[in-house]
Amino acid sequence: MPHTLPALPYAYDALEPHIDAQTMEIHHTKHHQTYVNGLNAAIEGTEWAEWPVEKLVGAVKQLPESLRGAVTNHGGGHANHSLFWTVMSPQGGGEPHGQLAQAIASQLGGFDAFKEAFTKAALTRFGSGWAWLSVTPQKTLVVESSGNQDSPLMFGNTPIFGLDVWEHAYYLKYQNRRPEYIGAFYNVIDWAEVERRYLEALK
């Protein structure tokens, strides 16, 4: 069955004023759809066509050379955006609680230190890419960034939330003011969903 564009769990205008409706609609229906289409075109008729996108992206280095570029770019784009939509919510913001909050405190020096590190990762990613909070194979948290549509899955880590810092994610509202966009993102993070992903990654 071909990969499909996931429906958003909220309306395009639900994250206003932090992320505008026009950006959300274009980002979802145009950019993400393009990644889905590109991935399907690349793997159609192959033994990997039925693989979940996360498994496919995680195994990209084991794929034939002829497929690696498309799976990295289009598969990575599909996986990254599929996660991105779910870790935002109109009821988002604030700080994490529970086991995730405890892990951030013990492993990353607390929420303020985490926020500083994550903001730096997003700000200093030159050109297009992502900032991530991921879980390593050793089950520890790490703040990292990746270029283009590379995913932490390609390097053995499990992303539990990420911020898209491609210009298409913010330029209509924020133009070149990436720091302002990053600051706005903290107001829509769905920490309950991030913790759910954290606990899943620990299994």
UniProtKB/Swiss-Prot annotation:
InterPro entries: Mn/Fe_SOD, Mn/Fe_SOD_BS, Mn/Fe_SOD_C, Mn/Fe_SOD_N, Mn/Fe_SOD_N_sf, SOD_C_sf. Mn(2+) binds at residues 27, 81, 164, 168. Homodimer. It is an enzyme of class 1 (oxidoreductase). The gene is sodA. It comes from Pseudomonas putida (Arthrobacter siderocapsulatus). SUPFAM superfamilies: Fe,Mn superoxide dismutase (SOD), C-terminal domain, Fe,Mn superoxide dismutase (SOD), N-terminal domain. This is Superoxide dismutase [Mn]. PANTHER family: 37S RIBOSOMAL PROTEIN S26, MITOCHONDRIAL, SMALL RIBOSOMAL SUBUNIT PROTEIN MS42. Belongs to the iron/manganese superoxide dismutase family.
